[in-house]
Structures are given as structure tokens and as C-alpha cells.
């Protein structure tokens, strides 16, 4: 289904990670949506020893290897008025952020819904990214994402994921985590894996989709410095 492993953590744990980033090796750093030049809705831990050519968006770019850090924030209960208002606010903020970095961030080769195709065409025609400050847009989406404390909510979501509000799920699904085998390493996954996989991939989630339907990053290793 995918070609990498993402790391999800609560907002509180992410704030702790930020406190300890000075203890990272010299070749690693934490890149967040609030920082100038950041290009994604997820935070990244970056390893500068490796360089990749990324064929995403209107421009090809060379960048260091990264791991996505997906922050779990609280959200209102689905179906409520608060959820609808929050969803509209978050999706508006996310759209502004995408517009602000359209040439580098938006994957033009990905299958899109009709509304997403419309906004992409709008951005290409109007060059709206020239009038939206990327740093402001990043701080705005971060401010919206923090509105609900996960500890006080029944539901949580990794809002920085591609599924956006579709990532909403009962908080108890995350639980305290359990060990899972991924290739040749052990990772700490959520407790309710069955519910999660069924929601996002359907009841036949053990059957991988065709190659052209899998989430692939379209990258090529161009430099290795060790």
C-alpha cells in the first residue's frame, strides 16, 4: 500500500520531541510546518547524509531523506456541528497552505477528485502562490490544528496526513500501542489495527492494490554522504 513508515505521536509528545531536538546527531534536524521553507503538512525528521531527487509537483527537487512525523490532535465528535465547523476551518487553512507552495508541494500525477482538480487548475491559472505567504499559511494551519486538546476529546486525527479529516478515528484505537513486525524491524503500532486497516483499506486489506494504486514517493537516491 505504501513505500515507507510514518511516525504518529500526540501533540504533547511532539512538543517533547521539539525540546530534545538539540540532542539529535549533527546530520539530523526537525523540520516543522511553522518553519520558513517547510513544504509539507507533516513534520519531518531529516537526515542530511542522503540526497534524493523528488519528482513531485511542477518542479523536480533535490532534498535530504526524511521520516514523516504525524501529529495526533483532538477533533470534535464526527457528525456534530462543532465537527463540521472545525472541518471547514481546517480544510480552508490546508488549502491556503497548499496554494502557498503549489509548485513544490502538490503532486500533479496523483488521482484527484473533481473538486481537487478544480483547485489545482485554479492555482495553475492564477499563480496564487505568489500572493500567499508560505510561513503565515503554515502557522495558520498549525493554529487551527491545535484547537482541540486530544486528552479532552473522544476522537483524534493525524490531520497532516493526505486523508485530512478522513483520518478521524476513535481515540481508543491508538491505545498504548503494541509491537508489530514491519519487514525486518519491530515498530510500535496502534492497538486497534483491525479497525484502522478495515476503515482505510476495506475488509480485504491483506490484498495489496495494483502497483499503480499504491502510494509511492517517486524518488531517486542521488547522493550518499556517510
Name the predicted role of every residue range.
Residues 1-17, 184:
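Catalytic metal-binding acidic patch
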Residues 21-77, 97-201, 207-226:
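Conserved catalytic core of two-metal-ion nucleotidyltransferases
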Residues 79-84:
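A short secondary-structure junction signal
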